[in-house]
Amino acid sequence: MATPLFPTTVIGSLPRPAWVKDLILDRKEGRLSEKEAEQWLDHAVPVALALQERAGVEEVTDGEWRRESYVKVFAERVIGFEKDINPSGGLPYPGAVAPIEYHRPIAADEIRFLRSRTERRIKATLPSPFIIGRRMWHPELSTKIYPTRESLMNDCVPVIRKEIDALKEAGADTIQLDEPWLSVMVDPTFREKEGVEDVDYEMDLCVDMLNQALDGITGITTAIHLCHAHFERRHGSEGPYDLIMPALNKIRVEIICMEYATPVAGGMESLAQFPGETKLGLGCVDHCDPHVETPEEIVDRVEKAMEYVDKERIILHPDCGFSPSVQNPMDLDEAYLKLKSMSEASRILREKYD
């Protein structure tokens, strides 16, 4: 069966209700056992699924409601990390303090639960090797085991590939590696703040890590997600994608998901350099703006992208996850209404262009 034009998906996370945030933090601080938390979350996750289905989203996630954040989940499930010892970007992150080792599924159990409750396509999300190295390598505590960030990144690759095999077995249709660092490097202020001295080296390293993680993967659609990073409804960087477009053309992946609804990403003109065979995940809903876009506004954004990318290669999704960590103060109803508008825009576009 042919894939319809303008399919809809999400990037990963949905806003977490207060009681779900409490579950995650109580589990983290030991006030609730892992088993007790999972039992409660088994009641919560179907709500996240139902929201997406009612909004008309065709490829769904579990809202990442079982996770504290999109990136910390790696350290929570993989041996070798100590929690919240590494201040990175002004926030506490885990740090690698021992050789990392695949111990149990990172996201496969999430997917298996979701597969038992939906017939829709399912997207699984994992952090990229590069973002793990950037966020979880500590210049003092990690160096006895991993003398460089690169050495930690290299050890992440086989762990991620093993998890992708588990995700396929669990029923995932798409594996998306989240790689915000590649796009935030377009901002010279961000590069200076994070001590990025050789941006070409960093981009090449990022591309190499993504290719090592995804090269040769079959039986599941491969995707990466880029964004300008956000916290508390504010972006952490800004700038058009022109600087990184040559790097995107070197990544061996089926779908590249990018922000284009937010003004901080610049205009659609950068899509003139987008890889010619790769599908574009088009961010067409601004997750940082409380304004709920009309379907017509979204259609207009998609049609602007069609000036550069064939309609058969365009997938619709929000710019980013609505709540990459439990701290993000986004409204669940707002997310639903934005997703509903996006699905209606897809319907309008299909009627017009199919």
Where in this protein do the model-derived segments appear?
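Domain-level signal for soluble alpha/beta catalytic cores
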Residues: 1-354
